[in-house]
Amino acid sequence: MLRSLLLRRSVGHSLGTLSPSSSTIRSSFSPHRTLCTTGQTLTPPPPPPPRPPPPPPATASEAQFRKYAGYAALAIFSGVATYFSFPFPENAKHKKAQIFRYAPLPEDLHTVSNWSGTHEVQTRNFNQPENLADLEALVKESHEKKLRIRPVGSGLSPNGIGLSRSGMVNLALMDKVLEVDKEKKRVTVQAGIRVQQLVDAIKDYGLTLQNFASIREQQIGGIIQVGAHGTGARLPPIDEQVISMKLVTPAKGTIELSREKDPELFHLARCGLGGLGVVAEVTLQCVARHELVEHTYVSNLQEIKKNHKKLLSANKHVKYLYIPYTDTVVVVTCNPVSKWSGPPKDKPKYTTDEAVQHVRDLYRESIVKYRVQDSGKKSPDSSEPDIQELSFTELRDKLLALDPLNDVHVAKVNQAEAEFWKKSEGYRVGWSDEILGFDCGGQQWVSESCFPAGTLANPSMKDLEYIEELKKLIEKEAIPAPAPIEQRWTARSKSPISPAFSTSEDDIFSWVGIIMYLPTADPRQRKDITDEFFHYRHLTQKQLWDQFSAYEHWAKIEIPKDKEELEALQARIRKRFPVDAYNKARRELDPNRILSNNMVEKLFPVSTTA
């Protein structure tokens, strides 16, 4: 309405400016001519009286003022008229526009996002039961009413696999240790307990978990359902630590599963992606609490090839961190402290400050360079802590934020990171839950693929071939790929939905993760980084995954928007995993699919004729 009114006024004004010029056009009619009609002579009318002289013209500034004052008045009037012309019902007052105020969100609307801020939903149906009875009642009622309650853990999955706008259930309040069997080294816990919380609770019993992922804030239910893993070619993914579990299902109520009780469903549900039931309780096989010696040193791919078999077999835990656009490979091994020689006595050659200094120097140099390039831009280090106080990963984020999609700039940052690791070589001793953690950096996009790598006795070397091809791809396509490319290994899993599933006990699997950080809050820049990451991921998928039989980690897989790409992904998943068996179990345990979400439905489409 406002636009049409403005257009009318503009047209009228334009027409008005033409009226004076019309008086300058001479008419063909003259009062001094004689008009003849049927032989009669008509006397023309007397001339009109002279017009009064026009008022003196307004100055240009006065005319402009009146014009824009009129526009302003019209805009205000139109806005007020629009506002009062569309009343809202009482129950929708939060939607009403309020002058100079943001409309508040409803109090019952929950915003839930993953830790990287890459996936977010809002829902009014967010449930946190306090005990098993509450959970059972919630699942039963939701099943009867066909209300969705997708299980969600700590929200740490990079792809937000637990999120659903329709509704969620979170077990953060069900976080108790229920039983500890010190002799058998087993512990029974509620599934909402966090990994670090569990480790702290059982350390007085002399127990700990067999292996850990990079971080400790996951809920136990979530970490097993998505097939999370640590590293060590003799150690399986974390779902293999599950001895038995209690599953609250919509159709069959609470069922107990173990290797003895319905082993087929037990193995299927261990890594069940939250689609077969809400994991309420878990019994885990633990190990004696122990200290580890971590050895970090820098190598290169040529040297790694010579020692790879020994590195896999001789170390309890091992991982490689590759730094794109350099020859640097950071090798990290972890082994129990020797009972005879004790921890190593070697002291580091460099202090932490000395190790980080090269990165600090590059940051100082870079902010000067980018300030000169864009003098109107606020200095990146304004109103921020002194760079002497920043950790290496924080400095890396700030460096990348300056020009995250420039491959030359990213390569310089990677070279500085390689220098940091060269000066960080050495040993570290601590409890296993402290040593096996890893500072992953800030918010990020990540993709991790898993593929077979032979056996421990006879590695196929496909894992190193994969890395060689990946590094060539990065350099050929000038991908602004930051560090690290992380490579880890596990033994096989007996859970059919696990990417590391195998029926052969000796098989080992390699896990390779690529990354792009989101070191900025600027939405446009985050979108540009996101687009570049998905281009990076698409290239690796196209050129490497089929060649190496690689499949993505369930917590890192992303659903394609393109219909043909989605169909190709579904066909690929069906080739590797028992989709029909999984969907059959879903139909039996959750016929209304209240535990599902869009991601599960797209990955495991259920036939309507089944």
Swiss-Prot record:
- Sorted alphabetically, which keywords does the UniProt record give? Membrane, Mitochondrion, Oxidoreductase, Transit peptide, Transmembrane, Transmembrane helix
* Compositional bias annotation for Pro residues: 43-58
The yes or no answer to whether the keyword DNA repair is present is no
Any single biological process term in GO: L-ascorbic acid biosynthetic process
Cofactors that this protein relies on: FAD
Transit peptide: first to last position: 1-35
Q: At the top level of its lineage, which domain of life is listed?
A: Eukaryota
**One Pfam family of this protein, by short name?**
FAD_binding_4
EC number annotated for this UniProt entry: 1.3.2.3
Q: Which GO terms describe its molecular function?
A: D-arabinono-1,4-lactone oxidase activity; FAD binding; galactonolactone dehydrogenase activity; L-gulono-1,4-lactone dehydrogenase activity
Provide the effect of L156I. No covalent flavinylation and higher turnover rate of the substrate
Region called Disordered, residue ranges:
17-61
**UniProt pathway annotation:** Cofactor biosynthesis; L-ascorbate biosynthesis
Q: Cofactor binding mode, per the note?
A: Binds FAD non-covalently.
- Transmembrane spans: 68-84
The pH response of activity is noted as: Optimum pH is 8.8.
What Gene3D superfamilies would the database entry show? 3.30.465.10, Uridine Diphospho-n-acetylenolpyruvylglucosamine Reductase, domain 2 (3.30.43.10)
Q: Which SUPFAM superfamilies does the entry mention?
A: FAD-binding/transporter-associated domain-like, Formin homology 2 domain (FH2 domain)
GO cellular component, as recorded: mitochondrial membrane; mitochondrion
Q: Protein name, please?
A: L-galactono-1,4-lactone dehydrogenase, mitochondrial
Q: Which organism is it from?
A: Arabidopsis thaliana
* Gene that encodes the chain: GLDH
